[in-house]
Regions:
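Hydrophobic alpha-helical scaffolding
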Residues: 21-25, 85, 128, 132, ...
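Sequence-specific dsDNA recognition surfaces
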Residues: 13-18, 33-49, 63-94
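Extended, well-ordered alpha-helical scaffold/bundle regions in very large, multi-domain proteins
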Residues: 220, 228-229, 243-247
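Proline-centric
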Residues: 21-30, 122-134, 146, 150, ...
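Short coil/turn segments at secondary-structure boundaries
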Residues: 4-13, 45-52, 74, 152-155, ...
Length: 254
């Protein structure tokens, strides 16, 4: 049949009615936790001077994130003491995907420096050999994925918790198509930026057209309509099996 099923433990569940739209045959619907792990940040105690005096490590808040951009600087920095006591001495590495998790939900940025962030942001780590390809795919499309799955009052109220994020359904294409989708989106970026510039100069233009144009391109991408389907692509179901094997291997090493 044309129904979609998900196996959870020994139970097989029909999830067809939970799916927001159709995807190509060689894509799969999967839970976010099956393709990526994520970590929430922290805010060191504001009344503890040793955490904020002599700050040397960038500490990102949502206001420091720039939508779908690489970010390098923050308004505030934490001390070496704060890093050691509140973050176990661990910085989030440069190149990591960040996404706003509360308030302004779904804003994505790439870390341009080693840093830490607050609890309103998650750092995302794809569970896949070619992490950059999936990172770039999620960087471009997570905002739209989050918008598409706004099916609960909690998400609509801009409060997204770890459980809801883990179980969020993601349309997942083959790896080669992820790369093609990102390349296609990047081709449109200069055109959209130029239109944005012209829009700002022409006050009579519809102020919403820029956002609508950008969103329509991303919607085509997320539904598998932006680039031609290639029958030679390894199906996303096979990619998902590779990810599961890698995840299992990592758990076995702990």
């Amino acid at each position: 049949d044309n129904r979609h099923y998900e196996k959870v433990g020994s139970e097989v569940k029909d999830i067809t009615d939970d799916l927001p739209f159709e995807i190509p045959d060689n894509w799969v619907w999967t839970r976010f936790s099956q393709i990526a792990s994520f970590e929430l940040g922290k805010t060191p105690d504001r009344h503890t001077d040793k955490f904020w005096n002599n700050g040397i490590y960038p500490w990102f808040a949502i206001s420091d994130l720039q939508e779908r951009s690489t970010v390098f600087s923050t308004k505030e920095k934490i001390s070496a003491t704060a890093l050691k006591e509140k973050f176990a001495g661990k910085l989030v590495p440069q190149g990591t995907l960040l996404m706003s998790f509360k308030l302004t939900v779904g804003r994505t940025s790439i870390l341009g420096v080693d840093a830490v962030h607050n609890e309103a942001i998650i750092s995302v780590f794809p569970i896949i050999p070619d992490k950059d390809a999936t990172r770039n795919f999620l960087f471009n499309l997570l905002p739209l994925i989050v918008e598409y799955v706004e099916t609960t009052d909690a998400i609509k109220g801009a409060t997204l918790n770890s459980s809801k994020l883990s179980s969020m359904l993601v349309p997942f294409p083959p790896l080669t198509e992820q790369i093609r989708i990102v390349a296609e989106i990047e081709k449109f970026e200069p055109l959209i930026a130029e239109y944005d510039k012209l829009e700002q100069q022409a006050t009579k233009l519809d102020e919403e057209i820029y956002d609508k144009l950008k969103k329509s391109i991303l919607q085509y991408a997320i539904q598998g309509k932006l680039v031609p389907q290639d029958p030679n692509d390894e199906p996303a179901s096979v990619l998902l099996e590779h990810i599961r094997a890698e995840k299992k291997a990592k758990l076995g090493k702990k």
